[in-house]
């Protein structure tokens, strides 16, 4: 309970648990935390998931659309993320460790979803229904924008454990979370 606002309060990353708990118990919930709605998306790329990609996505969905996908380099983790974005139909934030990866993600997301995409990082500060950010920019800005995304994708998620970066994950209330990596070793 937060005496300053006279209401219950908790860490942003527990948002999904609070909403789900209220729903399951039948308690009314006046959700003033989230600043996102459904985002109707179509996948414009003509490509089918490989069996292991479908298995990874299905396991992620079965786990409440939260979890990690660990696949070797070049095995299509980006495509799994595309399917996750398509499945959730919510504004998404994709966080990558370098500006080169941010630019690759940005180009790919615009191509496969046909929507305006934003960038946070490398001197650019634009939000879109799908936004791509560096880890450092996410750490700086998610305190302000963490309520705008229903899904957060952490590319090269082993970088998340670096000092100062875990705070970005904690202040993002996205109920759906996907970590992508080829290895948990940093």
Question: Positions of the model-derived regions?
Answer:
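Interdomain "pre-motor" coupling segment immediately N-terminal to P-loop NTPase/helicase cores
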Residues: 1-38
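Conserved pre-motif I regulatory segment
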Residues: 34-70
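Walker A/P-loop
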Residues: 63-88, 93
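Hydrophobic positions in the central parallel beta-sheet of the AAA+
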Residues: 69, 94, 131-133, 152, ...
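Conserved helix-turn-beta segment of the N-terminal RecA-like "Helicase ATP-binding" lobe
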Residues: 95, 99-124
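Conserved motor-coupling elements within RecA-like helicase/translocase cores
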Residues: 121-131, 146-147
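SF2 helicase catalytic motif II
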Residues: 135-185
């Amino acid at each position: 309970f937060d005496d300053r606002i006279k209401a219950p309060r908790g860490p942003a990353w527990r948002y999904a648990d609070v909403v789900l708990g209220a729903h399951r118990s039948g308690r009314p919930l006046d959700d003033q935390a989230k600043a996102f709605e459904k985002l109707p998306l179509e996948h414009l790329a003509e490509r089918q998931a490989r069996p292991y990609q479908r298995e990874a996505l299905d396991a992620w969905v079965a786990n409440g659309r939260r979890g990690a996908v660990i696949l070797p380099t070049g095995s299509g983790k980006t495509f799994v993320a595309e399917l996750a974005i398509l499945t959730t139909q919510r504004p998404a934030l994709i966080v990558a460790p370098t500006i080169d990866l941010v630019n690759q993600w940005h180009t790919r997301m615009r191509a496969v979803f046909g929507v305006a995409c934003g960038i946070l990082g490398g001197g650019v500060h634009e939000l879109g229904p799908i936004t791509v950010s560096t880890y450092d920019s996410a750490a700086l800005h998610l305190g302000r924008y963490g309520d705008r995304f229903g899904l957060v994708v952490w590319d090269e998620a082993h970088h998340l454990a670096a000092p100062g970066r875990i705070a970005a994950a904690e202040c993002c209330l996205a109920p759906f979370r996907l970590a992508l990596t080829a290895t948990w070793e940093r």
